[in-house]
């Protein structure tokens, strides 16, 4: 957030963890802190730290008869429209120096999955093959606007995610809905409940609602305007850095 009289200029993501970036941003004119966002940043910073440690331990593990390091638990944060979820994802994704990372809108990702499945339909288990391909391409997968409303997505999502977890992919997702609220009143929803349980088991679930809607604040105040998250960082996948 910034005021009309004080233009907030975000720090560069380079050489920052999410928390140190947030602290640097908070020291600049025009930045308005939010307790709920700060809590989310701390959770993202914890995951960032675990991913960096995992990378170092995995490098030591390769080629040695050591125990494989434990994969960090991913994160699912949800809240209403205007709570700054895209901003939070911008910070995490921008600060993470992994080469094999990807950020994608969830519905675009599912459309891609269905396309890949059609291309591999002659294989015995096309979904497993698709998941293996994704795991080779991506170690940290970030979803914007995770939501399930289509039965075709709902019926394959559980196995899709389970395969990705088994392949060692770490997921981070934003959503307007808690996992238990996904696929509401959908056809055969009872068969989707194990997918909800899987999300709750494999991901840390965090509610970022704070009662502050920055988009509404924009409409109600001439002195304050919202900085679109896209202005902070280009969302292009696969920036240079660690795999």
Regions inferred by a protein language model and the residue ranges of each:
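N-terminal pre-Walker A segment at the start of P-loop NTPase domains
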Residues: 31-63
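Pre-Walker A (Motif I) flank of P-loop NTPase domains
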Residues: 62-77, 139
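Conserved lysine of the Walker
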Residues: 85
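AAA+/P-loop NTPase substrate/partner-engagement loops
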Residues: 94-125, 129-133
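Conserved nucleotide-sensing/catalytic segment adjacent to the nucleotide-binding pocket
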Residues: 118-165
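Conserved small/polar residues in nucleotide/adenosyl-binding loops
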Residues: 238-243
């Amino acid at each position: 957030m910034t005021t009309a009289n004080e233009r907030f200029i975000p720090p560069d993501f380079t050489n920052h963890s999410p928390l140190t970036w947030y602290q640097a941003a908070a020291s600049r004119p025009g930045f308005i802190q939010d307790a709920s966002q700060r809590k989310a940043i701390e959770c993202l910073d914890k995951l960032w730290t675990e991913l960096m440690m995992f990378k170092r331990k995995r490098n030591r593990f390769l080629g040695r008869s050591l125990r494989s390091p434990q994969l960090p638990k991913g994160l699912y944060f949800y809240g209403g429209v205007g709570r700054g979820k895209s901003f939070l994802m911008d910070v995490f994704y921008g600060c993470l120096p992994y080469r094999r990372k990807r950020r994608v809108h969830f519905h675009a990702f599912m459309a891609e999955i269905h396309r890949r499945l059609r291309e591999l339909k002659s294989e015995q288990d096309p979904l497993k093959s698709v998941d293996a391909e994704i795991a080779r391409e991506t170690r940290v997968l970030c979803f914007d606007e995770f939501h399930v409303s289509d039965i075709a997505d709902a019926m394959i999502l559980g196995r899709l995610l389970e395969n990705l977890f088994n392949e060692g992919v770490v997921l981070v997702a934003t959503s307007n809905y808690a996992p238990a609220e996904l696929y509401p009143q959908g056809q055969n929803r009872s068969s989707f409940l194990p997918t909800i349980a899987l999300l709750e088991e494999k991901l840390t679930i965090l509610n970022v609602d704070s009662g502050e809607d920055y988009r509404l604040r924009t409409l109600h105040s001439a002195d304050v305007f919202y900085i679109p998250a896209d202005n902070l960082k280009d969302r292009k996948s696969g920036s240079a850095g660690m795999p």
